[in-house]
Each structure stands twice: as structure tokens, then as C-alpha cells.
């Protein structure tokens, strides 16, 4: 994802790097807990496996996003799902955890000639995720951040925990 010009006013996305995954999950939980009663907050993830990993950290009232948007009503609350499930929707705060180099792109079962295609697909998915944020975007990772996000430090408010 190579930004040319920022199309939106507002704060830079936060990019928070963790030493361990449990601390990352706890920050996601804290961000959702702080804001979901007054704002729409979405936790967007790459895979259903990651959804299962984060679900226990979310409020019991959190709503799973589905690709079929029938009956969708916007409003404050906690939402979670895949990047695909959020397509076409917007949220006040979007949290995108697990953006480490080891998770995205997922090259675990790929052949060398598939790497470029998989990376392009994952870049498109990241684009869908980051563009769901109306006012705040928080990106998190444990270890090194994926190379699919721009490396320019000027684009983020970076921190480590």
C-alpha cells in the first residue's frame, strides 16, 4: 500500500508493536472497551482463525460482521470480522491486530511462483481494512510489522510495548 496523498484529515494511524501476542490482544480489548459504548469500533482480521483468537477478548455484545450486509444498521457498538466482512462499511475506530511479518502475507503453503500474487491479494485486503476507519485507525503487531504496509515513519504514530 503506497500512499500518495492523505485524503482525510485527522490523526495519523497508530502503529503499535508488541513483544508478545498476549499484550497485543489485551490492548485490542482495552481499545474496544474504552470506546464501543459511544462509537462504532471494528476489529478487523485477516482470517477466521484470528477471529477465534480475538473473540474472547471482546465484549459479549460484539457483533460478527458477515459478507452479506442484510439488515445492517450503523451505530455505536463493537464489531469484529474479516476484512472482506467489513467491505462497504465504515467505523469510527478500526483496530487491525496481528499485522506481523509472520502473519501477513501468509506464505506458509505457497510455492515460490505464488508469492507475488499472494502479496498483491493481501495488500488489497489491507487496503479494504484501513479504508473502513472514519476517524481513528490502530494497527498492531507482535514482532516485525508486515512489509506490505508502507515503511515511512512519517505516516504513523509508532510506539512499542
Predicted feature locations:
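Helicase P-loop NTPase motor core
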Residues: 1-72
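Acidic, Mg2+-coordinating catalytic modules of nucleic-acid enzymes
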Residues: 31-52, 78, 98, 108-111, ...
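A short acidic (Asp/Glu
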Residues: 52-57, 91, 149-152
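Active-site regions of enzymes building and remodeling cell-envelope glycoconjugates
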Residues: 59-64, 78-81, 152-161
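Conserved helicase core region in the C-terminal RecA-like lobe
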Residues: 65-103, 126-132, 136-142
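C-terminal accessory regions
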Residues: 98-161
